From Swiss-Prot:
Enzyme Commission number: 2.4.-.-
Keywords, ordered alphabetically: Cell wall biogenesis/degradation, Glycoprotein, Glycosyltransferase, Golgi apparatus, Membrane, Signal-anchor, Transferase, Transmembrane, Transmembrane helix
Chief location of this protein within or outside the cell: Golgi
Topological domains, Cytoplasmic: 1-33
A Gene Ontology cellular-component term: Golgi membrane
Glycosylation sites per record: 136, 168, 264, 374
Native species: Oryza sativa subsp. japonica (Rice)
Record protein name field: Probable glucuronosyltransferase Os03g0107900
Length: 427
């Protein structure tokens, strides 16, 4: 007869399966809770990322200094020349640092504080030679003389060549000079004389930063060069109301030299008679505000104008180009074949009008057509703060300003030069 088991043992063995099931359920609940917690954390992190990605950063005022200017790859060594080549000129006449040719001073000062300035010449990509040739105000008409420019630059090059090996290493090809006057490094305000003189031989392999630029070939741009804007003090953009807020009660504005009886100077006429024709055609037209006399507060007149006329003088370029953009007045450029600074940024066709010299008689009709069709579009493009900033030389340099644009153009120029060198080597 089989023996019956102990009742306690039977209860224990009977209850064992139920206790294991409870532990199994509890373990499943813990794993499920952990999974839910991880899922919740993942959802929160993803939501936060999407929110931050979709939130635009607050806009930064256009003319405030940037605190995050990227450090450009370009390394520039600035020669420390004796003061007679630069600083003495500013000390002798304060106009040297502020007039329309003062880009040579502004660029020098900006590069001295530039984050990419090379402390050692061996680390440099380019070499900047700071010579101020536009500061000799000894002439009767108040404009600077350029008669000393070639000799002063030649002295600077001789000094650089004698004291350091870098000029001789490249024959000056990696050296940068500023030529911020009428016909660049030809150093004469009259085009026929400038062409006859040409660029000094010792500068022809160097890089020139010049206000002069025309389409096609020209003796005065027969060297690697970057077209830069004429100097206008950055404060101009801050002195008057923001362009979009200005009351514009002048239709078309010009104040400057307009000869009633143009003089024949060696077979050439000032402005190719364009300014004379403007005066003859529109001098009595009430829509045109044309004045021949100087006026210290002329920029306030520009700020009140829809269109600012920018006819050529002896040279095609004019500080009116920059002043017009800064003051929100549409530049009307009357200078055939002119090349303008920083075209990829300024997009000149979108912010200005270009009228052929031969079409001055049709100017009123052209301006009326713009008013009737796309005036607001042009003004919107023109009033972009990026455009204004690109034309002023800040000291120190700010991201996007004229010096910053010059460095960008120099990088492009170097890249193009290196590609040419590689391609010639491959041949």
């Amino acid at each position: 007869m089989a023996m019956r088991g102990d009742p306690k043992q039977r209860r224990a063995s009977a209850s064992a399966p139920h206790g294991g099931a409870a532990h199994h359920v509890a373990d499943k609940l813990r794993r499920h809770s952990t999974f839910l917690l991880l899922l919740l954390l993942l959802w929160f992190a993803l939501s936060l990322y999407l929110f931050l990605s979709a939130t635009p950063p607050p806009p930064r005022p256009a003319f405030l200094p940037s605190t995050s200017t990227p450090r450009p790859a370009l390394r520039i060594y600035v020669y420390d020349l004796p003061a007679r080549f630069n600083r003495h000129w500013v000390a002798a006449d304060a106009r040297c640092a502020t007039h329309l040719f003062a880009a040579e001073v502004a660029l020098h000062e900006a590069l001295l504080a530039y984050a990419g300035r090379a402390a050692r010449p061996d680390d440099a990509t380019l070499f900047f030679v700071p010579v101020y040739v536009s500061c000799n105000f000894s002439t009767d008409n108040g404009f600077p003389s350029l008669s000393h420019a070639r000799a002063l630059l030649a002295d600077a090059v001789d000094l650089v060549r004698a004291q350091m090996p870098y000029w001789n290493r490249s024959a000056g090809a990696d050296h940068v000079f500023v030529a911020s006057h009428d016909f660049g490094a030809c150093f004469h305000p009259m085009e026929d004389v400038a062409i006859a003189d040409g660029i000094p031989e010792f500068l022809k392999r160097s890089i020139l930063l010049q206000t002069f630029g025309v389409q096609g070939t020209h003796v005065c741009q027969e060297a690697d060069h970057v077209v830069i804007p004429p100097h206008v003090p950055p404060e101009v953009a801050l002195e008057l109301p923001e362009p979009e807020k200005a009351q514009r009660d002048i239709f078309a504005f010009f104040r400057g030299k307009m000869e009633v009886h143009p003089k024949n100077i060696s077979g050439r006429f000032y402005s190719k008679k364009v300014r004379t024709e403007l005066l003859q055609k529109y001098g009595r037209n009430r829509k045109f505000y044309l004045k021949r006399k100087r006026y210290g507060n002329y920029r306030s007149e520009m700020a009140r104008s829809l269109f600012c006329l920018c006819p050529l003088g002896w040279a095609p370029w004019s500080p009116r180009l920059v002043e017009s953009v800064l003051l929100g007045c549409i530049p009307v450029i009357i200078a055939d074949d002119i090349r303008l600074p920083f075209p990829s940024v300024l997009q000149w066709l979108d912010i200005s009008l270009q009228v052929a010299e031969k079409d001055v008689a049709s100017l009123e009709m052209v301006l009326d057509h713009v008013v009737a069709t796309n005036l607001t579009v042009i003004q919107k493009n023109l009033w972009d703060p990026v455009k204004r900033k690109a034309l002023v030389f800040n000291r120190p340099m700010e991201e996007g300003d004229a010096t910053w644009q010059v460095l960008r153009e120099l990088e492009i120029l170097l890249d193009r030069s290196q590609r040419r060198h590689v391609e010639s080597w491959k041949r």
